[in-house]
Design a protein with these regions (language model features):
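Cleavable N-terminal signal peptides of Sec/SRP-targeted secreted and luminal proteins
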Residues: 2-18
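Cytosolic-side membrane-insertion boundary helix
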Residues: 417-488
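A surface/secretory-pathway sequence property marking extracellular, secreted
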Residues: 362-419
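Long, solvent-exposed N-terminal ectodomains/accessory regions
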Residues: 16-247
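Cytoplasmic C-terminal tails of single-pass
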Residues: 504-538
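Low-complexity, intrinsically disordered segments enriched in Ser/Thr together with acidic residues
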Residues: 133, 226-231, 236-247, 252-257, ...
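Short beta-strand elements of extracellular/lumenal beta-sandwich folds
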Residues: 331-359
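Edge strands and adjacent loops of beta-rich recognition modules
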Residues: 295-339
Length: 538
């Protein structure tokens, strides 16, 4: 027994030494921010770095000679997908809810569009090879995250020209459970212990993301979880007190042993009286830092407010974002409409935005109807660099890119007429008709330059839209079938009775006829008059 215990200790020590000498590093970080409307934003980030790794050459995909991959901290299933399809950069986000930029500001992870968004960079010699690999990547990630990413086919796939530049160096959701399996410590230790599915999916907004970036030092995999919780709604009280146990129903009981660093940063509110517990060991630039790596204790970080929370009645001043977006699809008919976008510049300086609109083929743009107004004055000069990819019915979406210029402290309105397509009756979903969801538009601030425009700020996603298409009366065939079946059944029954029954004439004899006739209470003569004669009884 003693020998077995020593052997286990030797294995543990050897594994620790191997981890220290390994080329793989794992870090985790949690950022917490109290919002103006009483909510709290949480941003979990889990980074894994595989040093000295390079992407696979796409020319070697035809040969089955790729070396076997052995990982200690790097997710094996994800590494196999990256090698199998020779992916240079990958971004996948799954979000639910609407991010309120005006009240919450910019998120830590900019990809907050509603639904699923998948971006990948792949090198190749032919378009057919890239299309086949793209389909394989979609199916592989759909199986890995238990998500319906296979529906992101050619009808929902596009290649924007300028909106999504690669972030790394390019060389010469039930989704939460599979997400946690990609972490070295799973959800048994570290910050991942706070990821309670019941509380995350109950948040006002939540999203998970997977980001693979090839850097000069190696490949970096960043797994992120963002959510916005409302402590006032969860607690049922009028105070915005929050803690790990109250919002997640869990605490950080132990640190992840393989993490190089495990930190929690809490952005302290700029106003009000409150108390942060436990006492932060380091406060810098209004942010409290906690190091969970070297502390062997149970962590339940939170804040307490002595007074009741009062909801703000006006927008934050100054504005949390440089511009605001409102997007609508106008029109009451089911064959035509108008796309309307209202942009408000909250700053004094002129602002340029890179505008990307991706619509499924069921919505067609009329570019000659584009109108741009600035403070109710026609200003078509505020739009430039228009790029448009025509949609192909049942095959490719429409992609519209342009640069919009917003004068300082102004409101710019962009309008464009659209046409709504007619679908086949087999293309309508089998469930109740609620309309068709349209993806959000994306706006990226640009810096004005004498040579070119470079990305300046984070992307801003507009709310998604719902379009009402012409829907056939699916109840009419059922009514016709029921009416026809009723008529056929009635006629068939009558004809069947006529053909199967045998009619016989029965003649009754006079005696039997009299016996069978009912007796009468009064006697009558042949003339029908009553008998009035009397007789004596002796």
């Amino acid at each position: 027994m003693l020998r077995t215990g020593l052997f286990l200790i030797f294995l543990l020590l050897s594994s620790v030494f191997c981890l220290e000498d390994s080329t793989e590093e794992f870090e985790e970080h949690l950022s917490i921010k109290s919002l103006k409307d009483g909510r709290v934003a949480f941003s979990f980030t889990f980074k894994t770095l595989l040093r000295d790794a390079i992407p696979r050459d796409p020319r070697t995909l035809a040969f089955d000679n790729d070396d076997s991959q052995h990982y200690t901290l790097f997710p094996l299933t994800l590494g196999q997908i990256l090698r199998q399809y020779a992916i240079t950069e990958l971004h996948l986000t799954l979000n639910a809810g609407k991010w309120n930029y005006d009240a919450w500001g910019y998120p830590d992870e900019p990809d907050v569009g509603v639904g699923a968004e998948l971006r990948a960079w792949m090198a190749g010699d032919s378009i057919s090879s890239i299309d086949d690999r793209w389909q394989g990547v979609r199916n592989a990630l759909a199986g890995l995250f238990c998500a319906s990413l296979g529906s992101l086919d050619e009808q929902r796939t596009t290649s924007p020209r300028s909106t999504f530049p690669p972030e790394g160096a390019l060389p010469d959701w039930e989704n939460l459970t599979p997400f946690l399996k990609l972490l070295p410590c799973k959800s048994r230790s570290g910050l991942a212990m706070l990821l309670n599915p019941h509380r995350i999916f109950d948040a006002d907004w939540h999203g998970i993301g997977l980001h693979v970036i090839w850097r000069p030092e190696g490949v970096e995999v960043r797994l992120s979880v963002q959510l916005v919780s409302d402590p006032l709604r969860i607690s049922g009280q009028k105070k915005q007190d929050w803690s790990f146990s109250s919002l997640f129903d869990r605490k950080v009981e132990k640190a992840c042993p393989v993490a190089k660093s495990s930190r929690v940063s809490v952005e302290l509110p700029s106003s009000g009286v409150y108390r942060v517990y436990p006492e932060p060991p380091q406060v810098k630039d209004g942010i409290a830092y906690y190091d969970l790596k070297n502390a062997n204790e149970v962590w339940d970080i939170g804040t307490m407010w002595p007074t009741d929370f009062e909801y703000p009645l006006s927008k934050p001043n100054p504005a949390l974002v440089p511009f605001s977006v409102r997007r609508n699809l106008l029109g009451s008919t089911q064959d035509r409409g108008q796309l309307s976008i209202v942009l408000t510049n909250n700053e004094q300086d002129v602002l340029q935005l890179l505008y990307l609109e991706t619509m499924p083929w069921i919505i067609q743009f009329y570019l000659h109807t584009i109108r741009v107004h600035a403070d109710d004055a026609l200003r078509d000069d505020l739009i430039s660099n228009i790029s448009y990819i025509l949609p192909i019915p049942h095959a490719r979406p429409a992609t519209f890119e342009s640069v919009l210029t917003l004068p300082g402290r102004s409101t710019v309105t962009f309008t464009m007429d659209v046409a709504k397509a007619f679908l086949r009756y087999t293309e309508h979903p089998p469930d109740a008709q609620r309309g068709w969801d349209l993806p959000p538009a994306i706006f990226t601030p640009l810096r004005q330059s004498s040579h070119n425009s470079t990305n300046l700020g984070k992307r801003v996603y507009s709310p998604s839209l719902l379009v009402d298409l012409a829907t056939p009366d699916f109840s009419m065939p059922y009514n016709v079938i029921i009416f026809t079946c009723s008529v056929v059944a009635f006629i068939f029954g009558s004809v069947f009775n006529v053909l199967t029954r045998k009619f016989i004439v029965v003649r009754l004899e006079p005696q039997k006829r009299s016996e069978s006739s009912p007796s009468k209470n009064l006697d009558s003569d042949e003339s029908g008059k009553p008998d009035t004669s009397k007789s004596d009884v002796h």
